[in-house]
Amino acid sequence: MKVLVIGCGRVGSAVSLQLRAAGWDVSVIDENEDALGRLGDDWTGEFHVGHGMDIQLLRTAGIEDADAVVVTTDGDNSNIVIGQMAQKNFGVRSVIVRILDPARADFFKTRGLDVVCPTQSAIETLTTAVRAVEGALA
């Protein structure tokens, strides 16, 4: 299976390393060449320097053969646009996008993107933890 990961920060690099360890063919794009260091000296996947909206770079990185695309840059707008490009321009069936803004996350879920919203996950986890305290004190 082949995955293209766009964004190699803390999340993107961890996803890339875990998928590579599980036997996936992993190709990574990041604007910062130094991000390759997050993958370690023994990285055996591909790494491409550039912007995830660059159509030629997406092709070079293998988007046309990708079974999945994971978009984890540091900007919601970029992640949304790149995710939509992967779906509409390249026909990638499994596109997972990190969106930090819960309102945007809900909206783009209805547009066919698989959305991960860590902000919403944190809100739900924290609220559940507080309610558990309430129940323990009753």
What are these regions (language model features)?
Residues 1-138:
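Cytosolic regulatory regions of ion transport systems
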